[in-house]
Structures are given as C-alpha cells and as structure tokens.
Amino acid sequence: IRYNVNMEKDSLFEIKTIEQIRTSLPRSKNKYGIPKSVSFVFQELYKDIVTSIITTEITADYILYGMQEAYQENKEFSDISYWVQGTSDNEISEWWIFGADGQGDLWLFDTQGKVFFYDHDKECMCEENFKCMEIDFLQWLQLAFLFRQYEKSNRYTNEDKAKLKNELSKINENLIDNLPFDYELCI
C-alpha cells in the first residue's frame, strides 16, 4: 500500500525543516520496530521516522519505505544472486535500502549514513553501481520535498527553475551534479 503525500499548498521551493517533513508524512496506526535480526546501525532520525510511517510516495522518484517494506526489500536484496559475483554477506550487510523511485531503481545508504542511488539498468548490485549523492537521510528528505513542491507547482518557468536550483544548492552545493535522473528538461 502506497500513500501519496497530500500537503496543503506549499510555498514554492522552500527547504522543509525536519518538523515540517515529519508532520507531512502519513503516520502508521502501529509503530513498527526494527526486527531483531537486523544488525544495520541506523541514524536516529531514520529509525524515528520509518518505524512510525507507512510507505509514502513523496514524488514518483522519491518513495520512502516504512519499516515493514524496507525490511522486506532488504531481506530480498540480501540474496547473493542480486550482487556482483564474489560479494560477501558482510559487504551486503553494509547497505540498507530505504526507498525506491517507482521504476525499479533503489535508494540506499551505507553504514556512514551517506545516501546512494542504484539504477537497476546497471544489473548487479555493488558499490561501483551505486551513485553517491553526497547527502544524508535528512537532506534526501529535503530534496524529495523540494521536487514535490516543484512538480506540484505545475509552473516550469525559467524563474522557477532558477529558484529550484538555488534551493538544491543550499542542501548541498554539488547536489545538482549528483542527481541520478536527467533533470535537464526541468532544471
């Protein structure tokens, strides 16, 4: 079950605070803890958010898994057959899938909390096939909500594109260069 975030009219292209993001994400009726079998060490913010939400489509390219779905995805992708030959269970356990883009691509982070993007067209999973975004989970949420505002505005003027680029560079000065999708048409 996926839930589209339906917030009130956003100010155009404003980086959301963590409080604004938290109140925008749909809460689950139940809090789902991290299964005891999971040894990955999560950032507190990630644990706090995903254990209390349902899987949420912020935009089509930014789907945030609730803990139940994240656990199932990671359980499936921990199968060695998805990974480059010779990858060890130890190496696989250094990654956590926390979201998707709706087209088979995945959002994941490493044990340091850095966000990566995996394009399923790259076939086997391995660090070389993961694009480092040079952002953390909070910045990923801010990125997702910026694109949500941009897409919802339905106004793709040059002025709006410039505002979006400006806000993206506030998250991380290299973020535009690190985006995994070809956003040239929109920004």
PLM features per residue range, with description:
Residues 6-107, 173-187:
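A surface-exposed partner-binding patch
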